[in-house]
Amino acid sequence: MNLLGFLAVVALSTASVQAGTIDHNQVVPFAQPEATTISQKAAIKFKPQIHITNGCHPYPAVNEAGETSGGLKTSGAPSSSCKGSGWGSQVYGRSTWYNGKWAIMYSWYFPKDSPSTGLGHRHDWEHVVVWIDNPDVANPTILAASPSAHSGYSFYAPPSSDSVGGTSVKVNYESNWPINHALDMTSKSGETQDLIMWDQLTDEARAGLNSADFGDTFAPFTDDNFKTALGKAWPF
């Protein structure tokens, strides 16, 4: 092996070590950047609220170095060790045109999905797709919302007025024992998190999410999953 080949192997080995998993409460989120593009401005404008009825609160899933959360075992109460990160939380966004509608996917990560001790699984990803007419008009209109639920979706086209606060749809995260957690629309106000769009993540963070193994769940906005998820979330 020549010197350049050896150095390449060392670099790849170092990167793989650096971009491993770390404790769920040690993942530092991205600060919400200033929006500079039409799509980024629309994503902030329509950023949703999430109300937590039971279970974990959202946590960041990846840091700027590409290290991803190791999650939590399903021991203890549904919200045990996951009532919120001291570093702050995160909502992940990705958007595109799909069948003539503008789709904005907002995704949250939870360290575990456990209705009660021993039930459920490590890691949970839930998301809502907000469908609007056009991000590049003065007053875009919400046409529909598709919250994720147990590998499928609920469809609201359009969502009811009491489940939208201004331009922010309101979703609820809840488990109806013994079934795992899911999202649905709600009239209850919730919390918001710093938004980071897919194109605003570092290269390392995108690579970390693309290659991460989240067990029984997956990040719906990664390169392998995004378009397929939009097809399943299509509400029209």
UniProtKB/Swiss-Prot annotation:
Gene Ontology cellular component terms for the protein in this record: extracellular region
Motif (Conserved undecapeptide motif I): 103-113
Role played: Secreted effector that contributes to virulence during infection by P.capsici. Induces distinct chlorosis at 3 days after inoculation of host C.annuum leaves, and all the chlorotic areas gradually turn brown and become moderately necrotic at 7 days after inoculation. Leads only to chlorotic areas, without necrosis at 7 days after non-host N.benthamiana leaves infection. Induces cell death in hot pepper.
PANTHER family: DOMAIN PROTEIN, PUTATIVE (AFU_ORTHOLOGUE AFUA_5G00600)-RELATED (PTHR33657:SF8)
Location relative to the cell: Secreted
Factors inducing expression: Expression gradually increases to a maximum at 7 days after inoculation of pepper leaves.
InterPro entries, per database record: NPP1
Keywords associated with the record: Secreted, Signal, Virulence
Gene encoding the protein: NLP3
Organism: Phytophthora capsici
Family of this protein: Belongs to the Necrosis inducing protein (NPP1) family.
Entry remark concerning the domains of this protein: Key residues/motif important for the effector activities are degenerated in most NLPs, including the nlp24 peptide consisting of the conserved region I (11-aa immunogenic part) and conserved region II (the heptapeptide GHRHDWE motif) that is important for phytotoxic activity.
Short motif (Hepta-peptide GHRHDWE motif II): ranges: 120-126
Name assigned to this protein: NLP effector protein 3
Disulfide bonds: none
